A protein has these predicted regions:
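Conserved helicase NTPase motor core
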Residues: 4-16, 20-23, 55, 63-64, ...
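P-loop NTPase Walker
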Residues: 1-109, 220, 274, 278
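Non-catalytic alpha-helical coupling and interface elements of nucleotide-dependent molecular machines
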Residues: 45, 72, 76, 100-105, ...
Length: 281
């Protein structure tokens, strides 16, 4: 019989509810991480699921490392010998980057690509600001500050559009002139990334989604492999993250999301409470 430890009845139910779509909502300090750890252990020990068949997405590297450590220790205490490092555990960005790296030849990126951090991205736009300043309507879009400040504003627009999976062609054909300007800004920026063999924080997920959508075999292999998906802090997910989750889980439909709708009444890097409130029942 599975040892649930100090789990209460609600947690036991969440741990053992392995099949189908599962939504777990709880406030801070109510043992959400504990429940996720036990759930992963339950899948491995009781259901015979291999580590590589489980994906767990978090929002910080610290949280991902904590999950790996706690799952490893829990399994060791139960004398279950598996390699937890084979699990897909990490932030959405690190998981998407892993998928890209494993299938690099099917992306626009070459082997020596460079990943831009926040400063690198801003500096790239600043260095190429002349490509943006002549775009029609750009002055109405940006403040009256200097090029560095305006470059930062451009990056904010770009990141938001990328994370919400906004279609460039739809932007450029919109009736609103300001939206058409945004479309041109995004188009110029993406050309810069392609020319420089670059990828940034906000486009990692976009590139991963494109890879999956454009390569049926890769998608099907991942769908076959990833039988159980668990998403922590689901209230923080944005549109593209939600799309990737349901794309990867489309075959087995075993998706568990953990979130707190009380903490989700804000947007951070595009995150929206809509995702948790609209989760399929």
């Amino acid at each position: 019989m599975f040892n649930y430890g100090n789990a209460n009845e609600a947690q036991k139910e969440a741990i053992s509810a392995t099949d189908g779509l599962v939504l777990i909502t709880a406030g801070p300090g109510t043992g959400k991480t504990f429940t996720l750890v036990k759930r992963a252990v339950y899948l491995i020990q009781e259901c015979g699921i291999k580590p590589e068949q489980i994906m767990m997405a978090t929002f910080t590297e610290k949280a991902a490392k904590e999950l790996i450590t706690r799952i490893t220790n829990e399994l060791a205490e139960r004398n279950v010998s598996v390699n937890v490092n084979e699990m897909y555990i990490g932030t959405f960005h690190s998981l998407c980057l892993r998928i890209i790296k494993e299938n690099l030849e099917f992306t626009r990126l070459k082997r020596n690509y460079r990943l831009l951090d926040t400063f690198d991205q801003k500096y790239l736009v600043f260095r190429n600001f002349h490509k943006f300043k002549n775009i029609e309507g750009i002055d109405e879009l940006l403040s009256k500050g200097g090029s560095w400040k305006r470059s930062d504003e451009i990056c904010t627009y770009i990141n938001h559009l990328s994370e919400e999976m906004v279609d460039i062609e739809a932007l450029q054909s919109d009736d609103n002139p300001g939206i058409r300007t945004l479309g041109r800004v995004l188009s110029v920026y993406q050309e810069m990334l392609e020319e420089g063999n670059l990828i940034d924080f906000s486009t990692i997920q976009t590139e991963c989604y494109k890879l999956l959508m454009q390569n049926k075999q890769i998608l099907e292999e991942l769908q076959d492999t990833l039988q159980y998906l668990m998403i922590d802090e689901y209230q923080d997910t944005n549109y593209i993250q939600e799309q990737i989750v349901f794309l990867l889980g489309a075959k087995h439909h075993n998706i568990c999301v953990v979130g707190d709708d009380d903490q989700g009444l804000y947007r951070f890097r595009g995150a929206t409470i809509r995702n948790i409130l609209e989760f399929p029942h």
